[in-house]
Regions:
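A metal-dependent hydrolase signature that marks the N-terminal structural subdomain at the beginning
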Residues: 3-77
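Active-site-proximal beta-strand/loop segments in catalytic clefts of secreted hydrolases
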Residues: 23-26, 67-71, 97-99, 130, ...
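Structured segments of extracytoplasmic/periplasmic soluble domains
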Residues: 41-50, 127, 131, 147-150
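Active-site scaffold of zinc-dependent metalloenzymes
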Residues: 81-112, 138-151, 155
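Short alpha-helix carrying the canonical HExxH Zn2+-binding catalytic motif
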Residues: 111-125
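Catalytic Zn2+-binding segment of zinc metalloproteases
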Residues: 123-139
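Amphipathic heptad-repeat alpha-helical coiled-coil/stalk segments that mediate oligomerization
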Residues: 158-159
Length: 160
């Protein structure tokens, strides 16, 4: 059995303002500023978690740590196959897979920019306490469906 989440104990204040920091791991060849700029765009998307009342604020010392990490780091840190990303359920640590960030996931049927949006929203969903869900075939895939692994009869979707 594979575990796709780390378990955390952090709980957000009722204000629903989430302060986060962002890093690109030293073994990942990707410009940090570009990563940060894209994160800010994806987290502020009106169809993302902001539609549920969350506001995301970049703060270099923020309690939520978002990292662009190599597949090897994710495998070691999260105990997962190197083709996935991971986050703590209700926690503070979110690891985005650098290979997926650069190339996407064919099984998701999403273009790269949309896949990145999905990836950020899905993993942030875990930070916010949401677990994986199933889908209703023919309907848009819920953001918490593991679209990286396939759509299970749903249509591709990036909306929360």
């Amino acid at each position: 059995m594979l575990f796709f989440l780390l378990v955390g104990t952090f709980r957000f204040p009722k204000t629903m303002k989430i302060r986060y920091s962002a890093e690109v791991d030293p073994d990942v060849d990707y410009p940090k500023q570009e990563f940060l700029d894209l994160l800010q765009i994806y987290l502020a998307d009106p169809d993302g978690w902001e539609s549920k009342g969350y506001t995301f604020i970049y703060d270099p010392k923020g309690p939520v740590k978002i990292r662009l990490s190599s597949p090897a780091t994710i495998a070691k840190t999260c105990g997962l196959p190197g083709n996935l990303s991971c986050a703590e359920l209700g926690g503070r640590h979110l690891y985005l897979n650098a290979s997926r960030w650069k190339h996407g996931a064919k099984a998701s049927q999403l273009p790269l920019d949309s896949y990145r949006q999905y990836m950020v929203s899905h993993e942030m969903g875990h930070i916010l306490g949401h677990e994986h869900v199933k889908c209703v075939p023919g309907k848009p895939a819920p953001i918490m469906l593991q679209q990286t692994l396939g759509l299970k009869g749903c249509t591709p979707n990036t909306k929360v």
